[in-house]
């Protein structure tokens, strides 16, 4: 594989994460405007965004098999057509049913693209380099999560309709579409060149189960925590701006943490540093929940920084449980993480209604403790040390 081809594929991976990050994180910015557009209360409008999450979940789950049937380049190009149709549907339709369908299609497209992006990184890089590359790729999710809410705020402040925000997000996919030209993708399944040696199917092992549980608990814990921090802070008497600043601080330090750890991880055994980071994140979250208002910004900044490498390290370790990176295995762990996203309000909503926001934060803290236990237990069964090598292809 040529170096320019590898760079193109790597950029497709970066942009695939940016696309999903933009779609997921911009939701809160435009929800009120969309509710006004359809003359609905915001509470009932938020339910329609479940279609976006459902699309992401279904596509990541199915793409473990679709990758072996439909070439990756074909999937990405077809995804561009679907993206254009979905954005056009948002622009020209005043039907709530069509809006929900368009959101579902956007979810499908971003889920397929993100699973392809993850798989490309696991194919292009090996060993410790794979972990640092995946981490840098994941930082594009957070970067888009910082940039596109600002784009949305800029457009909405000038009374430009909300659907132009999604047109701007579509430009990310346009860049992916352009990059597919003159670019060779790894072939899978029936499209792959089969050698004379029979392919040995590898068993995943119990370590994959530990990592899948860790992925689900981590995402559910993280989103359950960050979704209710503003309400919790307001309950303590903080202003809306100060409560919002806590969330911004978290994502900002999360992004800087990803960049820092994409360099740091190369020098450590991945399972050991993951266990340390999971333990630190659980302790820092507990200190945030039980600490004074004066210390809350510092605790959430350090929590964002030290928890930034956890999810990507889980995926990287999963890909290293077999000698050859398996798209089904990587997608299985991604699916478990996405289930965590889907369950966020299903789990935390009733807890907040019954016991208040602090109970939701403590639940998230408990989930982080489960992540620590899973990562610690993984140390006894992980196969990554025998499968990882420091060199890239």
Swiss-Prot record:
Short name of one Pfam family: MFS_1
Membrane-protein topology: Multi-pass membrane protein
Membrane-spanning segments: 11-31, 51-71, 78-98, 101-121, 134-154, 162-182, 206-226, 245-265, 273-293, 298-318, 332-352, 361-381
Keyword set includes Nucleotide-binding: no
Keyword Protein transport: no
Subcellular compartments: Cell inner membrane
Alphabetical UniProt keywords: Cell inner membrane, Cell membrane, Membrane, Transmembrane, Transmembrane helix
CC annotations in GO: plasma membrane
Molecular function (Gene Ontology), one example: transmembrane transporter activity
Similarity comment text for this entry: Belongs to the major facilitator superfamily. TsgA family.
PANTHER family named in the record: L-FUCOSE-PROTON SYMPORTER (PTHR43702), PROTEIN TSGA (PTHR43702:SF3)
Name of the protein described by the UniProt record: Protein TsgA
Species whose genome carries this gene: Salmonella paratyphi B (strain ATCC BAA-1250 / SPB7)
């Amino acid at each position: 594989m040529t170096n320019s081809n590898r760079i193109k594929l790597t950029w497709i991976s970066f942009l695939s994460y940016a696309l999903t990050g933009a779609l997921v994180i911009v939701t809160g910015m435009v929800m009120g405007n969309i509710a006004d557009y359809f003359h609905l209360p915001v509470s009932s409008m938020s339910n329609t965004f479940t279609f976006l999450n459902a699309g992401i979940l279904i596509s990541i789950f199915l793409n473990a098999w679709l990758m072996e049937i439909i070439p990756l380049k074909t999937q990405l190009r077809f995804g561009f057509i679907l993206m254009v149709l979905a954005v056009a549907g948002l622009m020209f339709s005043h039907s709530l049913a069509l809006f929900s369908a368009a959101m579902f299609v956007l979810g499908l497209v971003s889920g397929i693209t993100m699973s392809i992006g993850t798989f490309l990184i696991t194919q292009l890089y090996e060993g410790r380099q794979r972990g640092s590359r995946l981490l840098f790729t994941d930082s594009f999710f957070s970067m888009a999560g910082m940039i596109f809410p600002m784009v949305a705020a800029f457009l909405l402040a000038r009374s430009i309709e909300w659907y132009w925000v999604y047109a701007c997000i579509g430009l990310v996919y346009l860049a992916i579409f352009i990059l597919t030209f003159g670019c060779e993708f790894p072939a899978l399944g029936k499209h792959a060149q089969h050698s004379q040696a029979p392919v040995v199917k590898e068993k995943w092992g119990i370590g994959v189960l530990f990592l899948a549980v860790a992925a689900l608990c981590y995402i559910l814990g993280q989103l359950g925590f960050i979704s209710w921090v503003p309400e919790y802070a307001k309950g303590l008497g903080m202003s809306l701006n100060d409560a919002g600043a806590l969330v911004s601080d978290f994502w900002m330090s999360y992004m800087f943490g990803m960049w820092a750890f994409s360099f740091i991880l190369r020098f450590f055994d991945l399972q050991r540093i993951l266990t340390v980071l999971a333990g630190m994140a659980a302790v820092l979250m507990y200190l945030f929940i039980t600490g004074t208002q004066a210390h809350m910004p510092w605790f959430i900044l350090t929590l964002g920084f030290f928890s930034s490498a956890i999810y990507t390290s889980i995926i990287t370790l999963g890909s290293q449980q077999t000698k050859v990176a398996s798209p089904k295995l990587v997608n299985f762990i991604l699916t478990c993480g996405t289930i965590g996203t889907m369950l966020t309000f299903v789990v935390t909503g009733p807890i907040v209604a019954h016991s208040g926001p602090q109970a939701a934060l403590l639940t998230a803290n408990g989930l982080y403790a489960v992540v620590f236990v899973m990562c610690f237990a993984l140390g006894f069964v992980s196969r990554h040390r025998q499968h990882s090598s420091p060199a890239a292809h």
